[in-house]
Amino acid sequence: MPQSVNGHANGGDLERIAVKVGQKIHVILVTDIMYIQSDGDYVQIMTDQHNYIKEETMKYFETNLPADRFVRVHRSYIVNVEKILRIELYEKQSQMLTLKNGDKIRASASGYKALRTVLNL
């Protein structure tokens, strides 16, 4: 069974995330998330359609998102493995992930190791 970076075999079972934007609350399905990026005391949740900002920690998402689908590939990024198009060598100790929407994310050596485990590489 794949291990996430946090050591939990299955990770969490979070299915949706509520984000308040002004007077509205948007409900995001985790399957729609491309990646999550840390931004100080907040995180940016990137989907195909929109980018959302939420006051939450990366550790919270790392623990609560499904570990077979989401991997922390860098201290600043958690990626949905189903949204990865390509993985390429970037520098000696890192890889560059190209997502289906064209965004590029650098994976650290430990993040790439965790990604390889989830992808069975």
Predicted regions and their residues:
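Conserved binding/recognition cores within well-folded domains
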Residues: 1-100, 104
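Short, basic/aromatic-enriched C-terminal tail that caps enzymatic domains
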Residues: 110-121
